[in-house]
């Protein structure tokens, strides 16, 4: 709580706050909220999983040899109700948006090609949404809200059974005490 809570930025969507721009390849938690006062209105909210914290969180154990991890997004999802006071969290689920990263540079029209390339690279984070990864079992109402607001077709939705964005697994490779599970380094034969 002390490490994660201060770096979270929950964003709720309502009539005065439009659907936020979701950064390319960022991991987020979507939530459907019910107002405690009205009881019948549903609101959408999203929280980006902070990249400044490690995605794998080691859970302390009584036994030194027992090593257990939990994913940061699971911690956030299970405690998301603490971010939205006066709301009941109806459902929550992780998602990730992939955006079009193509560069469209008119070389003939660009006065300064380097400046134009830099500008286009900055825009890549906010291109058109072309893929939506969601955790298998996401509630239909939550999925439909994401699809409608991102402008994604059904063929661009990928239900993932397991964690989204597996790049974090490389961090597990360096964990001490598991040398027997690692492949031996490959040594190429010298050139004769």
Regions found by a protein language model. Name each.
Residues 1-192:
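N-terminal localization/anchoring segments of enzymes in phospholipid and broader phosphate metabolism
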């Amino acid at each position: 709580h002390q490490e994660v809570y201060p770096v979270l930025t929950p964003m709720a969507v309502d009539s005065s706050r439009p659907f936020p721009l979701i950064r390319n390849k960022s991991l987020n938690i979507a939530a459907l909220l019910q107002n405690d006062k009205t009881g019948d209105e549903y609101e959408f909210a999203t929280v980006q999983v902070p990249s400044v914290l490690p995605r794998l969180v080691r859970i302390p154990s009584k036994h030194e040899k027992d090593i257990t991890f939990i994913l940061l997004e699971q911690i956030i999802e299970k405690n998301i109700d603490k971010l939205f006071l006066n709301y009941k969290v109806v459902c929550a689920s992780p998602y990730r948006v992939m955006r079009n990263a193509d560069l469209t540079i008119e070389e003939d029209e660009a006065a300064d090609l380097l400046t134009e390339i830099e500008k286009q690279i900055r825009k890549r984070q906010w291109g058109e949404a072309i893929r939506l990864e969601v955790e298998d079992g996401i509630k239909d109402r939550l999925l439909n809200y994401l699809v409608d607001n991102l402008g994604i077709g059904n063929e661009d939705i990928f239900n993932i059974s397991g964690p989204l964005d597996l790049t974090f697994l490389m961090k597990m490779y360096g964990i001490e005490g598991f040398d027997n599970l690692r492949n031996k380094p490959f040594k190429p034969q010298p050139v004769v």
